[in-house]
Amino acid sequence: MTKLCLLLLPLVFLVSYSFAEEEITISISPNANPVQKPIGHQISLVCSIKKTDSNGEKPGMIWKKHGGLDRTGNVEVKKLDDYTLGLIIRNSSVEDSGVYYCQAQVGSKVYMNKMDVIVFEDIVFRDKQLHFGQVLATASVNISCEVSAKKDSVITYWTRHGKQILEGGKHKFYSRGSILEIQNYQPEQDAGQYTCEVFHVSSGSSNTKTVTLGTTGEKNYVACQQMCNSFCTDVHNKVFTNN
């Protein structure tokens, strides 16, 4: 009987030790993960340790981020109590985006949790005009998709009726592609909708704007012409494909 007790003692100790590990939890608030905020907003994270055992040992707690917390100078860490550590990002920038780790050490054991933070550029168009109405033939028309973000941090993609607009011929781009110039404007050819989509490279945020040129009659004429061309092309392809 004594030998059996001695054999079971390590097993009992192992079970008790594992159970003690499960009683320690580390959590980060807010509960939403990732945290997403526009540039310039304040972001607050709170890391908490829940410890139900009674030995009274206080955890050592730190915040970490790949590349360091002090790259932008916007991050401040505050100890709220022995089991709670806060992190504040003031006047947040895109560079403050990333994965933030809260690490706690209790005895020889290290616990960790993480929170994804995404700071995105709020893409706002400077020119609000969406319709030009009647445009004189042979005139030059400029359509602006300039935004509040820095020009070198965005990419602008232009389309007309679903097809990409490339520079050349009567189309020219200025201001790193944010302004489209249509030279020698011809209503029966150039009227219609022009769409730009602006992408912010670092944060991945985007915005879309559609500008309409020409009167209703001119737009309908161009749309009808495009439908006819598309129909003729389909018929032509089917005839020659079957032959």
Swiss-Prot record:
**SMART domains the record matches:** IG, IGc2
> What happens in the null mutant?
No visible phenotype. No defect in the positioning of ASI and ASH neuron cell bodies. No defect in the positioning of PQV, PVP, RMEV, HSN and AVK axons in the ventral nerve cord.
Tissue pattern of expression reads: Expressed in head and tail body wall muscles.
As for subcellular location, the record says: Secreted
Show which residues constitute the signal peptide. 1-20
Tell me the GO BP annotations in alphabetical order: homeostatic process; synapse organization
- Cellular component, GO annotation: extracellular region; membrane; neuron projection membrane
Which keywords describe this protein according to UniProt?
A: Disulfide bond, Glycoprotein, Immunoglobulin domain, Repeat, Secreted, Signal
Q: Does the keyword Oxidoreductase apply?
A: no
Where are the bilayer-spanning segments?
none
For this chain, the annotated S-S bridges are: C47-C102, C145-C196
The UniProt record lists the Ig-like C2-type domain at: 30-118, 133-212
Q: Does the keyword Lyase apply?
A: no
Quote the function comment for this protein: Probably not involved in maintaining the position of ASI and ASH head neuron cell bodies and ventral nerve cord axons of PVQ, PVP, RMEV, AVK and HSN neurons.
Report what the protein is called: Zwei Ig domain protein zig-6
Which species does the entry assign this protein to?
A: Caenorhabditis elegans
